Amino acid sequence: MSTGSLSDVEDFQEVEMLECDGIKLDPNKEFGISNDSNEESSTCDNGSPKKGRGTSGKRRKAPSKKSPLGNINQEGKQVQRNAANARERARMRVLSKAFSRLKTTLPWVPPDTKLSKLDTLRLASSYIAHLRQILANDKYENGYIHPVNLTWPFMVAGKPENDLKEVVSTSRLCGPTAS
């Protein structure tokens, strides 16, 4: 499939070199290789005989020609690589800042402690579980059910249906829909 880019010219040159080196690419297949015996005995466009594989089974490399299109293509690839590297550095910087902010919000961790990202996530998860437990213990305080204790569709988590009717009728829900 042709994209019209400079790499198409380079790909075409590589195909010509491979054909002259005893390997014929099948145009119907993306990366298929056909080795017909009659193709090996024919000649290249420049009149030199195609080089087949010898008894050693090794293929000789044709000397590569430096072309101005190849240099432009290499520069384009380098620009793309540099841009991708810059995006990845920026992404990693944002991720590192997020982990450092998460680390500073954990109450049990001294500020000078070095934690891995995995340890930070584990501590944050256990801290969230601890906070949920505190909320679960205090969920009926002042007659309110905290929204974190509600599950879809706004039922108190972990209560049988009979108990839910009693809790909902005697408790008020937090938020704009509270009655």
Curated annotation (Swiss-Prot):
GO terms for biological process: branching involved in ureteric bud morphogenesis; branchiomeric skeletal muscle development; bronchiole development; diaphragm development; embryonic digestive tract morphogenesis; epithelial cell differentiation; gland development; glomerulus development. The keyword Cytoplasm does not apply. It is found in: Nucleus. Residues 79-131 form the bHLH domain. Residues 23-87 are annotated as: Disordered. Keywords: Differentiation, DNA-binding, Nucleus, Transcription, Transcription regulation. Residues 34-46, 70-80 have a biased composition (Polar residues). GO terms for molecular function: DNA-binding transcription activator activity, RNA polymerase II-specific; DNA-binding transcription repressor activity, RNA polymerase II-specific; E-box binding; protein dimerization activity. Residues 50-64 have a biased composition (Basic residues). It holds the Pfam family HLH. CDD domains: bHLH_TS_TCF21_capsulin (cd19704). One of its GO terms (cellular component) is nucleus. InterPro entries: bHLH_dom, E-box_TF_Regulators, HLH_DNA-bd_sf. Gene3D superfamilies: Helix-loop-helix DNA-binding domain. Involved in epithelial-mesenchymal interactions in kidney and lung morphogenesis that include epithelial differentiation and branching morphogenesis. Efficient DNA binding requires dimerization with another bHLH protein. This is Transcription factor 21.
